[in-house]
Curated annotation (Swiss-Prot):
Domain of life of the source: Viruses
Keywords for the protein's UniProt record, in alphabetical order: Cleavage on pair of basic residues, Glycoprotein, Host endoplasmic reticulum, Host membrane, Isopeptide bond, Membrane, Signal-anchor, Transmembrane, Transmembrane helix, Ubl conjugation, Viral envelope protein, Virion
Pfam families membership: Foamy_virus_ENV
Region described as Fusion peptide: 570-592
Gene from which the chain derives: env
Organism, scientific name: Simian foamy virus type 3 (strain LK3) (SFVagm)
InterPro entries tied to this protein: Foamy_env (IPR005070)
Entry-listed glycosylation sites: N109, N141, N183, N309, N346, N390, N404, N412, N484, N522, N551, N776, N802, N827
Cross-link type Glycyl lysine isopeptide (Lys-Gly) (interchain with G-Cter in ubiquitin), residue numbers: K14, K15, K34
Domain notes from UniProt: The ER retention signal plays an important role in establishing the intracellular site of budding.
Residue intervals on the Lumenal side: 89-954
Acyltransferase listed as a keyword: no
Biological function: The surface protein (SU) attaches the virus to the host cell by binding to the cell receptor. This interaction triggers the refolding of TM and is thought to activate its fusogenic potential by unmasking its fusion peptide. The transmembrane protein (TM) acts as a class I viral fusion protein. Under the current model, the protein has at least 3 conformational states: pre-fusion native state, pre-hairpin intermediate state, and post-fusion hairpin state. During viral and target cell membrane fusion, the coiled coil regions (heptad repeats) assume a trimer-of-hairpins structure, positioning the fusion peptide in close proximity to the C-terminal region of the ectodomain. The formation of this structure appears to drive apposition and subsequent fusion of viral and target cell membranes.
Record note on modification: Envelope glycoproteins are synthesized as an inactive precursor that is processed by host furin or a furin-like protease to yield a functional hetero-oligomeric complex. The transmembrane protein and the surface protein are N-glycosylated.
Name of this protein: Envelope glycoprotein gp130
Length: 982
């Protein structure tokens, strides 16, 4: 293709073209003349005018086919931009008209509208009898829901939290104390020990150990008291003035019943029976009682050598059976604990008991303020105590020959002068228990030397096992011989191991004191505190008391450089488990309220760890047999473990009376407090262990919620909403109520907004606000109204607990209205909306709703469906008290964004047609036709093209402007820059 002509060439071409046109119209010139004229004109110099330059510019713009095509493309682009801009401008004008039109009105003042629909139920009657067919009808009862909100009973009480009390409890469990209370034998002690170890080891395997930022409980006075009391409450050390053993090898105490020849025994087991010398008829040749038992008579009681040791200078015992009448067994353990603690603090100097605490037999200045004197029957049940501690020897003998008493002397007694009458009164009257039968000897038959016949000096008394006991009780007249002999001087010094533990713990620490005193109790190899309380009496030879306390360093659970990290880790453990404990200062601030005088007594308790002995919390098990007592303890222990694993509180082991008294709470509030309290085990430790005894400690943290107000009759809000068909879109309208629960006490209704709530049996909230319900008046709340696009068809059916159904649907079936939420109750099974509706357990004729809500009339924006469709999520479109003007402004902010269109072009045109239908019907029909053509007729080709252009409209406008500027510069570049000179 030839390049475009320059200005001189174009002027020459133009002049030659004009010359040819002029010569064609002149016929007077010949061809040669015409050629001559053309040559002359070509040789003439042409000077362009302004008009020539303008014409040349037009020529230069369209000189080639490429330039022509560019101009055509530019014109097409400009036409498209103008078309789209004009169309959007017209649409915007239409949007403004649609926005200013009032939208639909929802009047939620209709309640309890009942509609009955009778449907013929298909029924096939099969019967052998002739029956007339009958038609049954299904009744559907419907009631509309005001404001699209359903209220259902809220069964859980709602508790407004006033404060939280944090309590740490250390629960001590000592099997030996429990065994002593229940009078268990050594065999059953092993079973009790195994049971406690099994339960607490299982609890320990499921709990992690960590520390509370409340201090070590071992430094606490209450802990020290309970620990010392649990281990050494009834332990004492008695010091003789000088070592004095028992004066004889045998002892005659006929007031004690004897074991029967055949079991079972009539009387319960007597400890002195362990020392009984039973007369056996078979003995080896040459056997004599003197060679084995010394001066002790066969048929009496033999005192073993360990009770007759000449070097015994002290007596160590752990028993509560020597206390006076002040220690009443009918009192509970806690009452006796307080009494003993008071007595010891008043009757001791450091750890030594004052003289007035002892009986006269122990000290000449004694007044029996703490211990009592021995009675004659004590030797039967507490033989070691009598033999080691008694200062005198009382012989109660019914043996023939003692004190020169004979049969003739008995018959001369005043009460025995009529023997025939006395025998009718009692068979034991006026006779000896043991008669003298001759010298002791063993007779053998033939060569038999091992199994010979033994003849005792006195008769065998087992057949009359209760002779002496009945004689002591004066059950019959007869001889009573009592002999009193001095054994020791009554100048005892008595020391309390409990007071020694309490006083030394302040100086040496509880761990060191416990170790030393427990070692002291094990002086003979058998721990005295693990013996039976009736026999826990041992003699010692010059023991060192007080013992030497070792320097025991407390176990450090964390390094110093990791102290802060470890502490924060423990607190995080609490936080992760749902507890609000965040430090000692915060805990005490939650617990302590100095301005509340009713709490001041409780504050001192809560600042320290609460220490509890398990045996003090149990029922009275002294009347139970061994296995029954173990089962009782097992039941309590298993229940405690189960409750702790459930993070609840076993109120058997911690009393709540102080909360009720100090906080002035009612019994109903106390029930809430007990139910909502939480527990957390923070350590389980076995402190001691042996074959027959074990002791454990359980550290438990409690959080006790103190209620400020309790809301009982509550209704829960179910916001189902209301359906609206707007601008071709199905929209779900909801009112955002400011409350979640309605409380109705008597006839007074309260609308409650709950914050920071946890569900733990009851609903416990930090904040409960009383708000106003939604309404159109100024006395009610202005609630936001939201719209959400939903798909057609919309069917929501929810079964209610009363047997009815909550229905919200966009279509009608079984005469159930569309768009309006309804409560539906049927009397027979019927299928609606593809769902089977079943009748309730009983027939309901009317569905009542409580409480009632105020009147609410709501106007929605005209294009609420368009707004919800644009946002594609639930948005606020108005409020219950918003003015029409504000509503229109809100709608404009949402709808005018369509000026810069986003989306499929045919769909947008159809949406515009739907929005215009009720405002400008003719335009709506035209737009609908265009949308149908673009989406259907042209199979989307043209529509897609236009849609792409619509998406790129801002880009195309920018490109068009850039092209115009570029073409202008290009056109300017085509113009000649310099004039040609001839």
């Amino acid at each position: 293709m030839a390049p475009p002509m320059n200005l001189q060439q174009w002027l020459l071409w133009k002049k030659m073209n004009e010359t040819h046109l002029a010569l064609e119209n002149i016929s007077s010139l010949t061809e040669e003349q015409k050629q001559q004229v053309i040559i002359e004109i070509q040789q003439e110099e042409v000077i362009p005018t302004r008009m020539d330059r303008v014409k040349y510019l037009a020529y230069a713009c369209c000189a080639t086919s490429t330039r022509v095509m560019c101009w055509l493309f530019l014109i097409c682009v400009l036409l498209i931009i103008v078309f789209v801009s004009c169309f959007v401008t017209v649409a915007r004008i239409q949007w403004n008209r649609d926005i200013n039109v009032f939208g639909p009105v929802i009047d939620w003042n209709v309640t309890h509208q009942a509609t009955y629909q009778q449907l013929k139920a298909a029924r096939l009657t099969r019967s052998l009898k002739v029956e007339h067919p009958h038609i049954s009808y299904i009744s559907i009862n419907m009631s509309s829901i005001p404001q699209g909100v359903m209220y259902t009973p809220h069964p859980e009480p709602i508790i407004l939290k006033e404060r939280v009390l944090g309590i740490s409890q250390v629960l001590m469990i000592n099997s030996e104390n429990i065994a002593n209370v229940a009078n268990l034998s050594q065999e059953t002690k092993v079973l009790l020990t195994d049971m406690i170890n099994e339960e607490l080891q299982d609890l320990s395997n499921q709990m992690i150990d960590f520390e509370l930022p409340l201090g070590d409980p071992r430094d606490q006075d209450q802990y020290i008291h309970h620990k010392c009391y649990q281990e050494f409450a009834h332990c004492y050390l008695v010091k003789y003035k000088k070592p004095s053993p028992w004066i004889s090898e045998g002892i005659i105490v006929d007031q004690c019943p004897l074991p029967r020849i055949h079991d079972p025994n009539y009387y319960k087991y007597q400890p002195i029976w362990d020392y009984y010398l039973k007369i056996q008829n078979i003995r080896p040749q040459g056997w004599t009682s003197k060679s084995y038992y010394g001066t002790a008579r066969m048929g009496s009681f033999y005192i073993p050598t360990f009770l007759r040791n000449n070097t015994v200078s002290h007596v160590l015992f752990c028993s509560d059976q020597l206390y006076g009448k002040w220690y009443n067994i009918e009192n509970n353990i806690q009452e006796n604990e307080q009494l003993l603690k008071t007595k010891l603090y008043n009757l001791t100097t450091y750890s030594k008991l004052k003289a007035r605490a002892l009986p006269k037999e122990w000290n000449n200045q004694g007044n029996a303020r703490l211990f009592r004197s021995f009675n004659p029957l004590d030797v039967c049940n507490r033989p070691e105590a009598v033999l080691l501690l008694n200062t005198t020897y009382f012989t109660y003998s019914l043996w023939e020959g003692d004190c020169n008493y004979t049969t003739a002397l008995i018959q001369n007694l005043t009460e025995c002068r009529q023997p025939d009458r006395l025998k009718l009164k009692h068979p034991y009257a006026c006779r000896f228990w043991r008669y003298k039968e001759g010298q002791e000897e063993v007779k053998c038959l033939g060569n038999e030397k091992k199994k010979c016949l033994y003849y005792s000096e006195y008769s065998s008394p087992e057949a009359q096992f209760d002779f002496g006991f009945l004689s002591y009780l004066n059950a019959f007249p007869g001889l009573k011989y009592i002999e009193n002999q001095t054994v020791r001087e009554p100048e005892y010094e008595v020391y309390s191991l409990y007071m020694e533990c309490m006083n030394s713990a302040e100086k040496y620490g509880i761990d060191s004191v416990l170790f030393a005193l427990k070692t002291f109790l094990n002086f003979t190899g058998t721990p005295v505190n693990e013996m039976s309380t009736a026999r826990a009496f041992v003699g010692l030879t010059d023991p060192k008391f007080p013992p030497t306390y070792p320097n025991i360093t407390k176990e450090q659970k964390r390094c110093n450089n990791l102290k802060r990290r470890k502490r924060s880790t423990n607190i995080e453990k609490l936080r992760s488990m749902g507890y609000s404990l965040t430090g000692a200062v915060q805990t005490l601030s939650q617990i302590s309220d100095i301005n509340d005088e009713r709490l001041q007594q409780g504050v001192s308790l809560l600042r320290d760890h609460v220490v509890t002995l398990m045996e003090a919390a149990l029922h009275d098990i002294t009347i139970m047999e061994g296995m029954l007592a173990i089962q009782h303890v097992h039941t309590h222990l298993n229940h405690l473990k189960t409750i702790l694993l459930m993070r609840k509180i076993d109120w058997t082991f911690i009393k709540s009376n102080w909360i009720k008294e100090q906080l002035q709470k009612t019994e109903d509030e106390m029930k809430i407090i007990r139910r909502t309290a939480k527990s957390l085990v923070y350590y389980v430790t076995q402190t001691s262990s042996s074959t027959t005894a074990t002791s454990w400690e359980i550290g438990i943290y409690y959080e006790i919620t103190i209620p400020k107000h309790i809301y009982l009759n509550n209704w829960q809000v179910i916001n189902i909403g209301h359906l609206v068909e707007s601008a071709g879109h199905l929209t779900l309208i909801r009112v955002k109520h400011p409350y979640e629960v309605i409380n109705k006490e008597c006839t007074y209704e309260q609308y409650l907004h709950l914050e920071d709530c946890i569900s733990q049996d009851y609903v416990i909230c930090d904040t409960v606000q009383i708000v106003s319900p939604c309404g159109n008046s100024t006395t009610t709340s202005d609630c936001p109204v939201t719209a959400e696009k939903v798909k057609e068809p919309y069917v929501q059916v929810s079964a209610l607990k009363n047997g009815s159904y909550l229905v919200l649907t966009s279509r009608t079936d079984c005469s159930i209205p569309a768009y309006v939420p309804s409560i539906v109750t049927v009397n027979e099974t019927v299928k609606c909306f593809g769902v089977e509706f079943h009748k309730p357990l009983y027939s309901e004729s009317k569905v009542s709703f409580e409480p009632q809500v105020p009147h609410l009339k709501l106007r929605l924006p005209h294009l609420v469906g368009i707004i919800a469709n644009l946002q594609n999520l639930e948005i606020e479109v108005t409020s219950t008290q918003e003015s029409i003007k504000d509503q229109i402004e809100r709608a404009k902010s949402q709808l005018l964004r369509l000026d810069i269109h986003e989306g499929d072009f045919p769909a947008w045109i159809q949406q515009l047609a739907s929005a215009t239908r009720d405002v400008w019907p003719a335009a709506a029909r035209a737009l609908q036709g265009i949308g149908n053509v673009l989406s259907n007729t042209a199979q989307g080709i043209f529509g897609t093209t236009v849609s792409i252009l619509s998406y790129a409209k801002p880009i195309l406008i920018g490109i068009g402007v850039i092209l115009l500027i570029a073409f202008l510069f290009k056109i300017v570049s085509w113009l000649p820059g310099k004039k040609k000179r001839n």
